[in-house]
Amino acid sequence: MKVMKFGGTSVGTPERMKSVAAMVSESGEQVFIVLSAMSGTTNSLVEISNYLYKKNSDGANDVINNLERKYMGHVEELYSTDEYKQRTKEFLASEFNYLRSFTKDLFTSFEEKNIVAQGEIMSTNMVANYLEEQGVKVCLLSALDFMRTDKNAEPDSQYIKEKLGAILKENEGYQIYITQGFICRNAYGEVDNLLRGGSDFTASLIGAALPAEEIQIWTDIDGMHNNDPRVVGNTEAIRQLNFEEAAELAYFGAKILHPTCVQPAKFAGIPVRLKNTLDPKAEGTIIDNVLLKGKIKAVAAKDNITAIKIKSSRMLFATGFLRKVFEIFECYQTPIDMITTSEVGVSMSIDNTTHLNEIVDELKKYGTVTVDSDMCIVCVVGDLDWSNLGFETLVLDAMKNIPVRMISYGGSNYNISFLIRESDKARALQNLSDVLFYKK
């Protein structure tokens, strides 16, 4: 069995839903489909929640009514028979009435999670009904029945495997199974989610639990590219990536794949394939455990980075200095992207500036602090083990005319990263492409 995940844009219109349905049914294979909410729906549900936090029931009801009209229009386009139009409209009406029920009560984060969950519940029901109307044997499963996190908000993989296995045993003989993308229950049985973007994670967790033959992530892009096509004109799709390479690219800016997605698949040894709904026959990108020795695969960039430098003579020959610095970032739950040290200073980069002022105030206890905003991280990804001679020369040659604030290498064998000004990003990405991939 293959797991196929389709994001919000892939099911964003009735026509897109029909295309996805045709794709999964015409293959003749037994597949497990993971669907996100229709594009724009989650934003609307979050908007409803924001109104309810402010006790603005009228504002919430306006958004609910507009969203309901939109969905009822989709029903008319999607189905060809009155029976399935009526069935789906009745289901959607009950969903929107459920959303309206929240406008009358106390509103907390618990209610917000219930509201946000409804987008995927609606999209999966619509696609399942359409497939059934087309005569396909389809089984709609609620992710709330088998997706669960533990007390640390981490996926409970053993529970997922056992519960999903039992559910599938009770529902044998279907060609297609469908479930929701990021909703789950927490350790206390409450409706929760794997955070936005977690539908990739869900697909990977389900694939590992089955175990699947392959996990496919479908978007409207032809796999991962060797550079950012929005910035660099001459990019190419990457045909193969190692799991570690894919994780680096996902973290450093490749929006096509969520960074957490590859971990369950990697540990289960299940390949992940990135495919394009607009060009289903395209090869896409395969992610597996194969590592091509000495091969540089791609360049990526992460924007909105802030650099922080602490300079202190007290750091010289001192022990425990870095621990104190790290404890400040931990206290404010702010992850560090890059770090470099010298005898009397340490430089770090962060992408979450929510508590920047508090962090800087705390750091000033230990030395002089300087902050640089509007920075970005450019990283080169591939098999960059230190024993592979020559890649450093190529990379540094490409960056020779770009002012570099920090360089990080050695924490991973799969990337070398540069912190530069955002204004220099386009030039850096183009230079790296020219030197690394086109030998200019």
Pin down the residues of each PLM region.
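A conserved regulatory-domain signal marking ACT and ACT-like small-molecule sensing domains
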Residues: 283-440
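A conserved active-site cap/scaffold subdomain adjacent to cofactor or substrate pockets
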Residues: 242-288, 292-311
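Structural motif
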Residues: 1-2, 30-33, 72, 114, ...
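Flexible loop/turn segments at secondary-structure boundaries
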Residues: 11, 41-42, 148, 185-187, ...
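Nucleotide/pyrophosphate-binding catalytic subdomain
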Residues: 1-257, 262, 421
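Glycine-rich beta-alpha junction loops
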Residues: 37-39, 221-223, 272, 276-281, ...
